[in-house]
Swiss-Prot record:
The gene is cstA. Keywords: Cell membrane, Membrane, Peptide transport, Protein transport, Transmembrane, Transmembrane helix, Transport. Its main location: membrane. InterPro entries: CstA, CstA_N. Involved in peptide utilization. GO terms for biological process: cellular response to nutrient levels; cellular response to starvation; peptide transport; protein transport. It is a multi-pass membrane protein. Belongs to the peptide transporter carbon starvation (CstA) (TC 2.A.114) family. It comes from the Bacteria. This is Peptide transporter CstA. It is found in: Cell membrane.
C-alpha cells in the first residue's frame, strides 16, 4: 500500500459524503432554511452573540474542535496497523461525527445558543439535564488539563515554539480590532497571516537572543501561564481574541496539512506497516486493549468526539450568520478534521514499524518485542535529539511529518527545522481548543451557579463572566500544575465518547420531534447504538483490567470510581431519552412540524 492511494480514496469519499449526506441532513432531516434569524442576530450583544462571516466561523469552529485527537489518536492507534484506524476514521466521521456535530449545533441554535445541558433539560427533563451538565463540566475540566499537558511538553524549554505560539495573541487582537473597525476581512486576514508566518520563521533567531533565554520556560511556569492566558481568552469578547486567533491559527493548521498532502504526492511514501499487526487482540506496547473497542476510544476527534458538543453548543451557535452556514461549519469541519486524522495516520505508518514502536515504547518494553530499529538512529542524528522512548504520539507525528518533508527535493537538510516547526504547530493546534473549551466551561459554570444566583446566568454580566472564567481556569489549572491526573487519556477517551453518545441522544430527540419521517431518527440511532455499546464495554474493560486491578500499571481507584460514575450518568440520560422517544412515538401531538421554532 502507498500513501497516495489512501489520500485520493479518502478525499473522494469525504467529498461525496459532504455533497450528498450533508445536503440530506440539512434539507430532509433538519429542514433548515434561512427565513428566521439566527441567535447571533436575534440576541446580538457585541460580545458573545455576534453575527460572523461564514469562513471566520468555520475557522473558529475547526480550530476549536481539531485539538490533540486527530493528531495523537491515529498515531497511537497505528499499533493495530493502518487499516483499523483508516476504516474507523472514514466510517466514524461520515456516519457518526459529522451527524453528531450538525445535530448538536442545530439543537443549540434552536434554543438560542444554550449549552447541551440546558437543551437536555428542556427536551428530556431536569434529571437528564443535570446529569448532562455534570458530565460536561467533568469532561471539560479533564480535557483542558490533558490538552494543556501536551502543550507543556511541546513548549518546555523550547523558546522558538513559545515565541511562535505567544506572538499569535497580539496578532489576533490586532486583526480583531482592525476587522471590527473596517469590516475588511480579506485585508485583515492577509496582514494577520503574514505577521503570523513572520513570527514562525524568526523563531530560530529569537531563541539565540536574551528574549529566547526569557522564553525558555519550565513546566511549572508554563502551567501557570496557560490558565492565565485561557482566563483572558474566556472573559474577553469573542471578536477581540478568540475568533480572530482561532481563524488565523486555522490558516496554519490547514496550510501545514495541505503541505503534508503535497509532500505525500511528491514523495509517495510506501506504507511499511501491515494492515493488521499482531496486537489487534491486545497486549500491545502502546495500548493494552484489543482493537475493539479501543480503536473507537483512542481515535475520537477525527471520527466522532463528544468534545465537539462543547463547541457546537457553546461558542459557534452564537456566531453563525445564517442557518445554512451549519453545513460547512459543522458537517464540513468534521470531514476536514477526518482528513487531518488520516494524514496523521499516514505520517505514523510511513515509518518503519520497529522505528514507530521504539519511539512509542519505553526502552525496556521495546527490547522485549524482538525488533531492530531501521532509520531511527539516522533520524535522531539529523534532528539532533534522541527519539527513543518519547511516548505519547506528539514526537511520532513530528518525526513522521519530518520524514516525508525531507524526502522532497531541496529539503533533505532541514530535518531539525521541520521537526521543531511541527512540534510548535501541534502546540498551536491544541491551544486553540483550550481557548474555546475554557469559554465553554465558563458557560457551564454560569448555568450551574445561575440556579442559585440568577444574575450569573447572564453571559453579558461582566462580574459573572469574570467569576466563571476564573473558576474554570482554576479547576483545570490546578490539575495541570499538580499533575495529579494519572492515566488521563484513557479516562478521557471513555468519557469523551460517552459525551458523544449524549450528543446523539439529544440529536435523535430533536430529529424525532421535527422530521417529516420518523425513520430519519436512524441517522442518529445507528451511530448511537454502536458508540454506546463500545464506550460501555471499554469502560468496563478499563475498570476491570486496569483501574481496579492492583497488578496493572495504571491501577487507580479514583479513575475507576470516576469511570463508573460517568457510565451511570450516561445510563440515566439514555433511560430518560428512551422514555421520551416512546411518548413521542405514541403521541404525535408531542412532535412539531416547524423545523425552526419561533
Amino acid at each position: 500500500m502507498n500513501a497516495v492511494t489512501i489520500v485520493i480514496a479518502s478525499m473522494c469519499i469525504l467529498a461525496i459524503a459532504y455533497r450528498l449526506y450533508g445536503t440530506f441532513m440539512m434539507v430532509k432531516v433538519l429542514k433548515v432554511n434561512d427565513d428566521k434569524p439566527t441567535p447571533a442576530h436575534a440576541l446580538e450583544d457585541g460580545k458573545d452573540y455576534v453575527p460572523t462571516n461564514k469562513w471566520v466561523s468555520f475557522g473558529h469552529h475547526f480550530a476549536a474542535i481539531a485539538a490533540a485527537g486527530p493528531l495523537v489518536g491515529p498515531i497511537l492507534a497505528a499499533q493495530f496497523g493502518y487499516l483499523p484506524g483508516l476504516l474507523w476514521l472514514l466510517i466514524g466521521a461520515v456516519i457518526g461525527g459529522a451527524v453528531h456535530d450538525i445535530v448538536v449545533l442545530f439543537a443549540s441554535m434552536r434554543k438560542n445558543g444554550k449549552s447541551l445541558s440546558e437543551v437536555a433539560k428542556d427536551e428530556l427533563g431536569p434529571v437528564a439535564g443535570f446529569c448532562t451538565g455534570l458530565s460536561m463540566l467533568f469532561i471539560i475540566t479533564i480535557t483542558m488539563a490533558g490538552l494543556s499537558m501536551v502543550v507543556l511538553h511541546a513548549l518546555e524549554r523550547n523558546p522558538w515554539g513559545t515565541f511562535a505560539v505567544g506572538i499569535t495573541i497580539p496578532i489576533a487582537m490586532g486583526v480583531g480590532l482592525f476587522y471590527k473597525k473596517t469590516g475588511n476581512l480579506k485585508l485583515a486576514s492577509t496582514v494577520g497571516f503574514l505577521f503570523l508566518m513572520a513570527g514562525v520563521f524568526i523563531g530560530p533567531w529569537v531563541q539565540t537572543t536574551a528574549l529566547g533565554d526569557f522564553l525558555t520556560l519550565d513546566t511549572k511556569t508554563l502551567a501557570i501561564a496557560l490558565p492565565v492566558y485561557a482566563f483572558f481568552a474566556a472573559a474577553l469578547p469573542v471578536w477581540l481574541l478568540l475568533a480572530p486567533r482561532d481563524y488565523l491559527s486555522s490558516f496554519m493548521k490547514i496550510g501545514v496539512f495541505i503541505a503534508l498532502i503535497v509532500g505525500v504526492f511528491v514523495v509517495n511514501p510506501s506504507i511499511p506497516f501491515p494492515a493488521f499487526t499482531e496486537f489487534v487482540k491486545g497486549g500491545g506496547p502502546v495500548l493494552a486493549g484489543p482493537v475493539w473497542p479501543f480503536i473507537s476510544i483512542t481515535i475520537a476527534c477525527g471520527a466522532i468526539s463528544g468534545f465537539h458538543a462543547f463547541v457546537g453548543s457553546g461558542t459557534t451557535p452564537k456566531m453563525l450568520n445564517k442557518w445554512s452556514d451549519m453545513k460547512p461549519v459543522a458537517f464540513g469541519a468534521m470531514l476536514v478534521e477526518c482528513l487531518v486524522g488520516i494524514m496523521a495516520l499516514i505520517a505514523a505508518t510511513a515509518l518503519q514499524p520497529a522505528d514507530y514502536f521504539a519511539i512509542n515504547s519505553t526502552p525496556e518494553v521495546f527490547r522485549t518485542l524482538g525488533m531492530n530499529v531501521v532509520h531511527l538512529p539516522e533520524l535522531s542524528g539529523e534532528i539532533g535529539l534522541d527519539l527513543e522512548g518519547r511516548t505519547g504520539g506528539a514526537v511520532t507525528l513530528a518525526v513522521g511529518m519530518t520524514y516525508i518533508f525531507t524526502g522532497m527535493p531541496f529539503f533533505s537538510h532541514l530535518a531539525s527545522y521541520f521537526f521543531q516547526f511541527v512540534i510548535m504547530f501541534e502546540a498551536v493546534f491544541i491551544l486553540t481548543a483550550i481557548d474555546a473549551g475554557t469559554r465553554v466551561a465558563r458557560y457551564l459554570i454560569q448555568d450551574f451557579f445561575g440556579e442559585v444566583y440568577k444574575p450569573l446566568k447572564k453571559t453579558d454580566w461582566i462580574p459573572g463572566s469574570v467569576f466563571a472564567s476564573a473558576l474554570a481556569c482554576l479547576m483545570w489549572g490546578y490539575l495541570l500544575y499538580s499533575g495529579d491526573i494519572g492515566s488521563i487519556w484513557a479516562l478521557f477517551g471513555v468519557s469523551n465518547q460517552l459525551m458523544a453518545s449524549v450528543g446523539l441522544i439529544i440529536g435523535a430527540t430533536i430529529v424525532l420531534k421535527i422530521a417529516d419521517k420518523r425513520r430519519y431518527i436512524l441517522t442518529c440511532l445507528i451511530p448511537l447504538a454502536y458508540l454506546y455499546v463500545t464506550v460501555n464495554y471499554a469502560g468496563y474493560w478499563m475498570v476491570r483490567n486496569v483501574y481496579l486491578n492492583p497488578e496493572a500499571a495504571g491501577y487507580s481507584v479514583l479513575n475507576g470510581v470516576l469511570s463508573i460514575i460517568m457510565l451511570v450518568l450516561g445510563f440515566i440520560i439514555i433511560v430518560a431519552a428512551v422514555k421520551k422517544w416512546a411518548q413521542m412515538w405514541k403521541d404525535p401531538s408531542l412532535r412539531m412540524e416547524a423545523s425552526i421554532p419561533g
